[in-house]
């Protein structure tokens, strides 16, 4: 919920304090790079010390980081910070937050892998994805409602939710038994170039380069094409993201639970859906057409990510689950490092170029996956 709140509100909030489109998208991109670099380390640490302490650390880091990030924009709205100073302080705050919160995702994914059989791995990852989808559905809806109280209200709410989640994990999640922990001397450092994981990593990074390019320019597209105010933009962006998340949720509770396909098959079908969505969004002039495009995007994301997580988990040993989860958790962040910056720059040249760039990325990933699968 918290992340989708931020994505829905950041574009209009950034414009409200005088930041340019490239500055706004670069805050996401640079902090995503920090997230990507830190995630594998947190994943390996969860193999050594257990899932619960790493998960709690990530959630507490998200809580504190969000409060600091929100305070920076509060100062910007009241004229205390402005221009380059505001941009640099906001960037630093977001990067610090990303450094710590990146422990949550790999530890949660590894915990799910610890407690499921190989035959049920894809379905289990889909269930974990369903929880993410519920957050993506609720987040934009909550963001739109809270935006009526001001553009900062959704961010304070996100911090409160993360704090509650940290308490819940501390109270309810059991510690990892000592005999299931991997000593430091036995930890194997997985790399992004590991041949067992390479195809999954390339596909996931490409997927999120394209998806983030659309997501992070969506607010600009809506505000400029439909002539919306800042608050109305936040509400409409939230509604569009909610459509996407709703279809992700539906796919994960129906298709992913009933069809027994190989992970690669799910990914190929999902990429076709993502390609259709990006092409539709490139030509929208009303919210109805945009909603259709977002539905395609949500469907594609719902098919791809659980399959990629499951495929990577099945490709490694029990002792490497945390490391593999950390690498896969870094992939969305790596995508967000590239996608928003390139799409933001293209948007300033011509708005339709941003989603067309995403469509081109989805097509390249799909072709690469088909060729690699045939070789195997």
Named regions from a protein language model:
Residues 93-132:
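Cytoplasmic helix-loop-helix junction between adjacent transmembrane helices
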Residues 38-51, 250-263, 347:
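Helix-to-loop junctions at the C-terminal end of transmembrane segments
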Residues 78-103, 289-303:
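Hydrophobic core of transmembrane alpha-helices in multi-pass small-molecule transporters
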Residues 60-83, 273-285:
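C-terminal ends and interior cores of transmembrane alpha-helices
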Residues 174-202:
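Juxtamembrane intracellular "pre-TM" segments in multi-pass secondary transporters
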Residues 263-308:
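C-terminal transmembrane helical hairpin of 12-TM major facilitator-type secondary transporters
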Residues 33-37, 236-259:
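Transmembrane alpha-helices of Major Facilitator/SLC transporters
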Residues 8-22, 216-236:
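Short amphipathic helix-loop junctions that connect adjacent transmembrane helices
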């Amino acid at each position: 919920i918290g992340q989708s709140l931020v994505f829905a509100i950041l574009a209009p909030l950034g414009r409200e304090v005088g930041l340019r489109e490239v500055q706004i998208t670069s805050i996401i991109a640079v902090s995503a790079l920090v997230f990507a670099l830190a995630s594998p380390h947190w994943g390996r640490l969860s193999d050594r010390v257990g899932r619960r302490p790493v998960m709690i650390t990530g959630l507490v880091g998200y809580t504190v980081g969000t409060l600091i990030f929100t305070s920076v924009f509060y100062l910007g709205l009241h004229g205390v910070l402005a221009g380059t100073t505001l941009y640099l302080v906001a960037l630093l705050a977001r990067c610090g937050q990303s450094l710590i919160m990146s422990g949550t995702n790999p530890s949660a994914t590894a915990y799910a892998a610890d407690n499921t059989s190989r035959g049920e791995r894809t379905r289990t990852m889909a269930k974990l994805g369903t929880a993410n989808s519920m957050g993506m559905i609720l987040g934009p809806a909550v963001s739109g409602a809270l935006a009526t109280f001001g553009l900062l209200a959704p961010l304070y709410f996100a911090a409160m939710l993360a704090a509650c989640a940290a308490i819940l994990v501390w109270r309810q999640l059991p510690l990892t038994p000592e005999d299931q922990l991997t000593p430091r001397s036995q930890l194997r450092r997985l790399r992004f170039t590991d041949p067992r994981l390479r195809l999954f990593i390339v596909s996931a990074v490409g997927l999120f380069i394209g998806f983030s390019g659309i997501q992070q320019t969506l607010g600009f597209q809506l505000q400029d094409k439909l002539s919306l105010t800042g608050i109305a933009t936040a509400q409409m962006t939230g509604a569009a993201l909610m459509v996407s998340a709703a279809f992700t949720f539906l796919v994960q509770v129906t298709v992913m639970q009933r069809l027994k396909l190989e992970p690669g098959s799910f990914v190929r079908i999902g990429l076709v859906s993502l390609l259709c969505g990006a092409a539709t969004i490139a030509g929208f002039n009303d919210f109805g057409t945009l909603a259709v495009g977002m539905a395609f995007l949500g469907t594609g994301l719902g098919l791809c990510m659980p399959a990629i997580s499951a495929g990577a988990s099945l490709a490694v040993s029990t002792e490497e689950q945390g490391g593999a989860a950390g690498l896969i958790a870094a992939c969305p962040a790596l995508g967000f490092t590239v996608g928003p910056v390139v799409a933001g720059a293209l948007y300033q040249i011509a708005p339709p170029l941003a989603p067309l760039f995403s469509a081109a990325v989805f097509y390249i990933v799909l072709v690469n996956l088909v060729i690699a699968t045939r070789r195997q």
